């Protein structure tokens, strides 16, 4: 799938596949923090956008934009400068890129995972980058007043990764007693017992290897089997490279009679409840319409879903 980064004239974003390393993890004894595979995967689970300049900011504690005093390094170009734009103790970076994800995919925008910065924190957002022609900003919020922070050129200021729109809404969360899954319960109890024994003996371990159970890291179950074929111990994301503009893909929608009835029913129910276009899009996505198509169908109904819905045939009885 293409993940595109469109550049306007004069834009030159510093974007790279995220690093799995962190200075604080390097500093742990024997770098033991890297034995935590979930940390490693999260660290590299996207692309980092780096600060284009050196900047310093100070927050007086007031709510207005003037309460954040930002000083950029001499010679910093205007489009690269950190600014105080929104108030509320925030520092803003304009991201010089227009990302385009495949149909039905959003972009999760946040700070680099497991990379704390004293006195300030990254804010997170989700943008529908499969259709939006709008750029976005990356914002950091002070966590205490009368505090000075610095951003260095080349420091990660933004972290992005695509997420499939509607996937969360299609999840059916359920609480189930563990005893209803005897195999899982047996494996859990065996692991819990082995973990207790391991923790009791860890102080007498003679080597680093003896202080690491490593079952999850190796993707091995309690019967020494490999439950999944696509277990990963690292991510290998591709860098952005020069390429030809891709044509906007149009998702193919194929529904049987039951699926079509479900979609029309969801749209009708949403309209009766006075749903907004955004709420209608969610209802359509839950009914099985791909995210990008759901947004377009909802938009076709106008800002208020009580307006006339598209004819059933426009929902795609077959390919198209």
Tell where the protein language model's regions lie, with residue ranges.
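Glycine-biased, low-complexity coil/linker segments
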Residues: 317-318
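Short, structured beta-strand/loop micro-motifs enriched in basic residues and often containing a Trp
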Residues: 30, 133-142
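Eukaryotic low-complexity, mixed-charge intrinsically disordered interaction/regulatory segments enriched
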Residues: 255-283
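Short, solvent-exposed positions on alpha-helices
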Residues: 149-152, 278, 292
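Generic short N-terminal amphipathic or hydrophobic helices
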Residues: 249, 262-263, 288
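Non-catalytic terminal segments and appended small domains
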Residues: 1-132, 147-150, 155-254
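Serine residues within intrinsically disordered or low-complexity segments
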Residues: 313-314
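Short, charged early-sequence alpha-helical segments and their helix-coil boundaries
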Residues: 284-287, 291-309
